[in-house]
Amino acid sequence: MDDVRLRIGGKQPIDGAAVSCPGAVDPVTGVVHGTSAVPCIHGIPLREMLSGRFGGVPVSIENDARCFAWGEQWRGVAVGKKHFTAITIGSGIGGAMIHDGNVIHGSHLCCGEVSNFPMGDPNREGGLCQWSDYTPVNLAKRYGKVLGMHLTGKQLFELADNGDETAAEYLDKFYYYTALGCILIQFAFDPEIIVIGGGGSARPGLLEELNEKTGK
């Protein structure tokens, strides 16, 4: 943040800042609750701290998936949509629910936390699986352990594209459980559309795979 302030502040005044971050973000108090891949931001007066770093300007913070949903509602595929769900596929699964044009936070700021949907093999080592276990990033970690090497989600895709049948089986789990998650969202929330973003959404043919898995 200091680097951003120095680079921008020397060219023009900073009037305010908006920050998206993982976790159960309380936009009113400016505190991040729950858990995420960035534990250092939880339970501290994050908005107040950021405002101080930027010279006391107003700062807004919100969950990253909700910011993605707002962006799609403003200038993306959800323009004109009043009821939709947005999910992001990265190291986990982010989610945001939009109803009557507004983000639903829920009574515990957890509405849209679809990453925790239980699914998969409950007897797998490590206990009950959840949707986030089936992202390309986490599937690559599991296959990497089998191979005895570090493997990224991108490398998992490359292995599958180059004929590695086991890698293809892991990716089939990604398609299957992503489709299952979308089906659960559709029946629970009945959105007009489900918007998919994040690094995992860049996979060519993803929508075709999901349509096949959902029987369309």
Protein language model regions, located:
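ATP-binding/phosphotransfer module of carbohydrate and carboxylate kinases, centering on a glycine-rich
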Residues: 1-18, 25-29, 47-59, 71-81, ...
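Short beta-strand scaffold segments in enzyme catalytic cores
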Residues: 94-98
